[in-house]
């Protein structure tokens, strides 16, 4: 028979689990980020099939074909796009990988995609995801010397959930780095 104490403990554990899981998300190593973003392209578009950056951002079919890596370890305060100094070691790892890629291939271009979970309105999640992507780009450029011309940003809000739930989910609150120079004119 369940007691109040047992039920309370179970409820507290259930509430704490997403936070514990988020805390356990680790930033991929710079080598892993490089390997993912420098892998052989999944598809090679002919020059006449290439698109504008704007069209690439709107076409999930093309985005799925691009080399990418999800970064779930950058933590933002609820409803905020500000990046705390405590997150800089994670961003430095990303910056190291991007700088090395750009040294080897000056034409490399990376899209920073911001994503949210489904909590909140569609409009607020859309705006927040855009702000977070811009915030990460700004930090990469200003604090870590990644060339800004190689980075584009976009926010998708709750449009592309990894975990299909309307509840809070740390896995859905992420940034995706997507290499897109193979797709644009």
State where each predicted segment sits:
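Periplasmic peptidoglycan-binding/anchoring modules of Gram-negative envelope and division proteins
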Residues: 80-113, 141-142, 177, 182-185
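Short acidic/polar alpha-helix capping motifs at helix-coil junctions
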Residues: 62, 103, 126-127
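Short, solvent-exposed beta-strand/turn patches at coil↔beta or beta↔helix junctions
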Residues: 46-50, 54-58, 62-97, 117-123
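Periplasmic OmpA-like peptidoglycan-binding domain that tethers envelope proteins to the cell wall
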Residues: 115-185
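Envelope-exposed proteins and targeting segments
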Residues: 65-74, 79, 106-108, 149, ...
């Amino acid at each position: 028979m369940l007691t109040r104490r047992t039920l309370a403990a179970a409820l507290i554990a259930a509430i704490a689990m997403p936070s514990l899981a988020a805390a356990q998300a680790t930033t991929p190593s710079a080598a892993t980020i490089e390997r993912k973003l420098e892998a052989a392209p999944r598809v090679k578009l002919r020059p006449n099939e290439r698109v504008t950056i704007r069209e690439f951002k709107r076409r999930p079919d093309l985005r799925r074909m691009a080399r990418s890596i999800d970064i779930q370890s950058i933590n933002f305060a609820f409803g905020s796009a500000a990046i705390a100094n405590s997150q800089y070691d994670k961003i430095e790892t990303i910056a190291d990988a991007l700088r090395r890629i750009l040294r080897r291939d000056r034409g490399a271009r990376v899209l920073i995609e911001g994503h949210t979970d489904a909590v909140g309105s569609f409009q607020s999640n859309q705006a927040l995801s855009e702000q977070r992507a811009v915030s990460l780009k700004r930090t990469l450029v200003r604090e870590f010397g990644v060339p800004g011309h190689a980075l584009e940003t976009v926010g998708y809000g709750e449009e592309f959930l990894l975990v299909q739930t309307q509840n809070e989910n740390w896995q859905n609150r992420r940034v995706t780095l997507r290499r897109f120079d193979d797709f644009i004119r």
